[in-house]
Amino acid sequence: MALRCPIVSVLGHVDHGKTSLLDKIRKTRVTQREAGGITQHIGASEIPIDIIKKISKDLIKMLGANLTIPGILVIDTPGHAAFTSLRKRGGALADIAVLIVDINEGFMPQTIEALNILKQNKTPFVVAANKIDRLPGWSSVDGAFITNFNEQKQHPNALTEFEIKLYENVIAPLAERGFEADLFSRVKDVSKTINIVPISAMTGEGIPDLLVMISGLAQRFMEQNLKLNVEGYAKGTVLEVKEERGLGKTMDAIIYDGVAKRGDYIVIGNPDGIVVSRIKALLKPKALDEMRDPRDKFKTMNEISAATGLKISAPDLDNIIAGSPLRIVPKNMVEQAKAEIVEEIEETAIQLDEEGIIIKADTLGSLEALATELRKVGAKIKKAEVGDVSKKDVIEASSYAQTNPLNGAIILFNSKLLADAKSEVEKYEIKTFEGDIIYKLVEDYEEWTKEMKELLKSDEFNRLTKPAILRIIPGCIFNKTKPAICGVEVVYGTLRVGCSVVDEQGKRLGTVKEIKDKKQENIKEAKVGMEVPISIDGTVILGRHIGEDDIMYVELPEPEVRILSHNYMGELRGDEREAFERYVELKRKLENNPFWGI
């Protein structure tokens, strides 16, 4: 059975050389315009195996490799955002990835992000340790690294510096994250150890080694996945929809299996439903030397086989979302394709909660990745959509926050707040998190959640009735009733204005309306040991219902007793706990219910 090209994605931190590497790969041997040269697809570059064999012949001979794949298809858009956007059933579209790391700088936030995404998707990868040309004393060449890595070609100090940087900035950070890795020439078992290929995207050093490693690993471990269904219909993923001069609305896509034919029907899975449209044209870019007119950039194809990038001209392509699954089928298979796509969408659909936050992302794949990471930290998700944040989203978030303030948040990955939403965010005090690094967004959200919980806990605790036991001081009954005014000692706990007080039989005496200090000024609370005059509004008559030296308890509602008991015993002072325990003991005795307050 024929094999297709493995699909390769390049990930890594900003400025570590992703684009430079792709540019260098694309330029390899292109200037010679030889037969079988690198083909520029829509959104991808195909490097035929003949080119790889030619530029890497010495290395292939040294390794004894027998490469049978037709080549490799490198996704042109680098970075983890593109990687997460390009999905297929069962995971990432890319068969293998290149994680690029600046050997001089080491791991940075987006490196960690990329590694997390690869781990989550179980995508095999090689590490390209870039910028070796910047190592002190390193003599870089345009060719294989392995033949340049010796004492005949390099100064001993440069070799020592290389080993130090390789270990400290690449091997050790990978080990910290659970990956065994080593220089590719030292790896004995590629199924257990990550291959590190030193490269220079500037000089071209190590590019042959990298291409051979990618090809060899893909062929060895993914042969089953690379078997091409040459007779079958095409399966793919939407890259983007855009306007093309002379063509109108077109769609760029990556096809990873089967054959697409002109006149077939394209079936696309969209969050709003299945879109079906008949293909007017299958387009591929013309080679540079074929472009007589800049407006005439494409050539029409009758059929195109996987793996490939292509442009599709068809009606009704509005509102198609990047990352959406697609099928290209003859008319009699449209219903089957629709059913397949519905099943695929249901498999990957984000499970929403009854209450929670709103998340937004630029593509379906990004949205899935964001939701997955948020779930790991216990986030509840009420709404998950592709696109920017509108005024309607903010108003919805404010309504969610009414149920629980922790729901008043919107997380935006590669999305933005629309103009009409910005003022609403301020008006409704909705917390927003914006960024292009998922793990950083999740960390920030987690930190905010922690702070909010502490704040809410503090607010709830402060709203709860504080336990207290009071004694009426002899000679300090100043007014017997309406209001009853007397001096009390706070024996245990904290007495607050607004609480109800009961006697030792549990009978309510009234509500504490005022507490005064020694200067006869109103205060909000009195703590243990304080002697203060208080006024009680209620039916109590001092001297008849209760008298000097008698004990009063602050009345604690049973629901509040449960909350205090379960959540806040550690927040109570020792004397407050004493007041609480004595009151609960009294209530259980009076109610003849040992489970009161539990």
UniProtKB/Swiss-Prot annotation:
Domain (tr-type G) ranges: 3-223
**Example GO molecular function term?**
GTP binding
Q: Which residue stretches, if any, does this entry annotate as coiled coil? A: none
Keywords linked to the UniProt accession: GTP-binding, Initiation factor, Nucleotide-binding, Protein biosynthesis
According to the record, the residues making up region (G1) are 12-19
Task: Fetch the InterPro entries from UniProt.
Answer: EFTU-type, P-loop_NTPase, Small_GTP-bd, T_Tr_GTP-bd_dom, TF_aIF-2_arc, TIF_IF2, TIF_IF2_dom3, TIF_IF2_dom3_sf
Database matches in SUPFAM superfamilies: Initiation factor IF2/eIF5b, domain 3, P-loop containing nucleoside triphosphate hydrolases, Translation proteins
- Residues that bind GTP: 12-19, 76-80, 130-133
Among Gene3D superfamilies, the record links this protein to: P-loop containing nucleotide triphosphate hydrolases (3.40.50.300), Translation factors (2.40.30.10), Translation initiation factor IF- 2, domain 3 (3.40.50.10050)
| Residue ranges of the region described as G4 | 130-133
G5: region residues: 200-202
Q: What segment(s) does the record annotate as region G3?
A: 76-79
GO CC, sorted alphabetically, is: cytoplasm
Residue numbers spanned by region G2? 37-41
Highest taxon of the lineage: Archaea
Carries keyword Lyase? no
Q: Name one Pfam family in it.
A: GTP_EFTU_D4
Spell out the family assignment given in the record's similarity comment.
Answer: Belongs to the TRAFAC class translation factor GTPase superfamily. Classic translation factor GTPase family. IF-2 subfamily.
What is the recorded function of this protein according to its Swiss-Prot or TrEMBL entry?
A: Function in general translation initiation by promoting the binding of the formylmethionine-tRNA to ribosomes. Seems to function along with eIF-2.
HAMAP family given for it?
IF_2_A
Its protein name is Probable translation initiation factor IF-2
Q: Which organism is it from?
A: Methanococcus aeolicus (strain ATCC BAA-1280 / DSM 17508 / OCM 812 / Nankai-3)
The organism that produces this protein has a lineage beginning with: Archaea, Methanobacteriati, Methanobacteriota, Methanomada group, Methanococci
Q: Gene name on record?
A: infB
